[in-house]
Amino acid sequence: MVELEKEKIVWIAIILLIIFLVWETLKDLIAPIVFGMAASYIAYPFHIKLSKKVGKRNSVLILSGILSIFSLIFFVGVTLWITDTLKNLYNYLDAFFSWLSTLNVPGFLSSLFDALATSFPEKLRSILLQYTLSLPKLALQLIVFLAVFYATLLNADFLAKEIYELLPLTNRELGEKMIEKVKDTVDAILKTWLFFSVVKGIFLALGFYLFKISNVAGSIAAGVLCIVLELLPVVGGWIMWLAGAIILLRRSMLLAIIFAIYGIITISPIPDYFLKPKFAKERAKVSSVVALVGIFGGWIAFGAVGIILGPIAIGLLLALIDAWREIGTKQPSKAHRSQDA
């Protein structure tokens, strides 16, 4: 018995040591790993359609190649314009939060906006500066991101099967429900909220640059702020194209009208009413408050990777609460059991 206890202690120590070493190895790569998996999840439907025409491996190679090009553009952009972009972004954020404080919104939103006004700019600064101060580290993380994307997309079916096989036989229903809850949350956050926000931010940045409202750095900063605004309730990216149209109005009425039409078609409200519902109709709905708290709470707590981890954590908590309620309704109360006896 003593020998068994000693052996158990040794194995526990070995397992803890392995976990510690793995964590120390991966802790600086958590963000690219999570984002690589998230990108593969978004790309999976396109991969399925493309693989029917060119084959599974060729489809993965094509999508990985496209993502590699965008990653290279991102790296070059960070190298060339990050300092000026940060300056412009701080100016935009300061003006935006000053305007936001004048809105008459519910108390919990007002508190959230105040918290964002104090923490968001500094959090953004710390995250971006750690890359600008170490471009080799950023390059390494992009390589890891692309490698994870390729491997996850190539083995997506196998990984999905393995996840379900790892579920314990006892309370398997709870495990499956939690997986479905994570899937619903990730679908709503990645394939609807974040996807549309990023696309709108890209269109706004292009519009600001093509219409010469700002330089490259200022246009990128405007696109980033558009993404942030799209994630907030009440407000949205329309504020940015409206601001751009007002700036153009001082130069040319015609340019201001054309840019306003461009903003209506590519940013808001046309995409919100005609495209977004088509993407979201087949997916479970996630409360906008839950998504908002998850995204920005995750951002404040974990940095950029918290945008994904925050909503998933809240989704899992809600799944556990639902399961607890179901168990409570299935089990009769003590009083009821005593009456039956």
Curated annotation (Swiss-Prot):
Task: Note one Pfam family from the annotation.
Answer: AI-2E_transport
Q: Where is the signal peptide?
A: none
Alphabetically ordered keywords of this record? Cell membrane, Membrane, Transmembrane, Transmembrane helix, Transport
Give compartment(s): Cell membrane
GO CC annotations? plasma membrane
Q: How does it sit in the membrane?
A: Multi-pass membrane protein
Main location, first listed in the record: membrane
Span-the-membrane segments of this chain are 10-30, 62-82, 93-113, 140-160, 193-213, 227-247, 255-275, 289-309
UniProt record similarity statement: Belongs to the autoinducer-2 exporter (AI-2E) (TC 2.A.86) family.
What protein name is recorded for this chain?
Putative transport protein PH1571
